[in-house]
Amino acid sequence: MVLNWRFALSADEQRLVREIISAATEFDEVSPVGEQVLRELGYDRTEHLLVTDSRPYAPIIGYLNLSSPRDAGVAMAELVVHPRERRRGVGAAMVRAALAKTGGRNRFWAHGTLASARATASVLGLVPVRELVQMQRSLRTIPDPMVPDQLGVWVRTYVGTVDDAELLRVNNAAFAGHPEQGGWTATQLAERRSEPWFDPAGLFLAFGDSSSNQPGKLLGFHWTKVHAAHPGLGEVYVLGVDPSAQGRGLGQMLTSIGIASLAQRLVGPSAEPTVMLYVESDNVAAARTYERLGFTTYSVDTAYALARIDD
C-alpha cells in the first residue's frame, strides 16, 4: 500500500473520501468520522492522509484527517478504511503514520468504539483518554417546556448576524478550554450557519429579563439540529450557559424548550422521533440532568492516545 500526506484534496479526492465514509457508515451503522472532518475536506486547515494500493491508478482505500493542536491541546486524528479493504493493516498503517508525524503526541477518535478499533488500539499500545457519550430519548412523550420567566429570562430564536457577537461570547465562555467547542471564531460560526440543516427557528437564545441583575444580556442558548439523512432524528447540537448564570437551571430550561420544538418538527408517522446529544463521560452532573429528562446511553465514542500522553 502507498500512503500520501496532502495539505489539500482535489474535488475528485474529496468525492472518493466521502464515498468511503458513506460505505463505512452503512457497514458499521456509525459514521467513522465527525461532522468537522467532513467540513474540512474542502479546506487546507488540516492534513489529509490517503492510502491506495501500490498498483497504478489504484483507488483510495483509506483516509485519515489530522487536525492541528488547539491552545495547549494535542492534534486529533480520525480515520476510515473501506469495508472491503479491512484486515489488511490499513488502519494500523495510518495510525503509525500519524504518530510518526506528531512524535506520538496525537489522539485518535474511535466513533462507536467498535471492536476493530479497540483491537487496533491494543496492538499499537494506545489507551482510552477520553469518552464522549451519545444519549437519546424518544420524542413521543415529553414533559412540558419550562417557563422562562420563572428563571428571570426571556427566550427568542436567532434573528441573524446581529446575534453573533453575543453568541460567540457565551459559547467561548461556556466551553473555555474545550477541544472542539471552545475558541470559536466568527468564521467557524458562519460555516455552521451555512450548513443545509441550519434553521434559525431552531436556535434558542435566553436573555436576562427586566427583573434580573443582567437585563438584556445573553445568558445561554440551545442550538438544535435536524438530521435530514436520518428521518425523525434531532439533536441537542450545542447547549451553552454563561458561567455567570450557571446553577440557576437555565440549561435544563433551554433543553426542555429545544426538545419541545424538535418534537413539533419531527413527530410523524414515518419514523420514531428521537432526540440525541453528546456529553463527556466525566461530566457526571450534566449526564444526571439529561437522565432526569429521560435520556439514556446509546453509544460511546472513545479517544485513544499512547499511554504516556495524559494531558
Curated annotation (Swiss-Prot):
Binding site for 1D-myo-inositol 2-(L-cysteinylamino)-2-deoxy-alpha-D-glucopyranoside: E35, E180, K225, E235, Y278
Documented EC number(s): 2.3.1.189
Keyword tRNA-binding: no
Domain of life: Bacteria
Annotated residues for binding of acetyl-CoA 1: L79, V80, V81
GO biological process annotation, one example: mycothiol biosynthetic process
Occurrences of domain N-acetyltransferase (ranges): 155-311
Binding site for acetyl-CoA 2: 239-241, 246-252, 283-288
Alphabetical list of InterPro entries matching this protein: Acyl_CoA_acyltransferase, GNAT_dom, MshD_Acetyltransferase, Mycothiol_AcTrfase
NCBIfam families: mycothiol_MshD (TIGR03448)
Subunit structure comment from the entry: Monomer.
Family: Belongs to the acetyltransferase family. MshD subfamily.
Name listed for the protein in its UniProt record: Mycothiol acetyltransferase
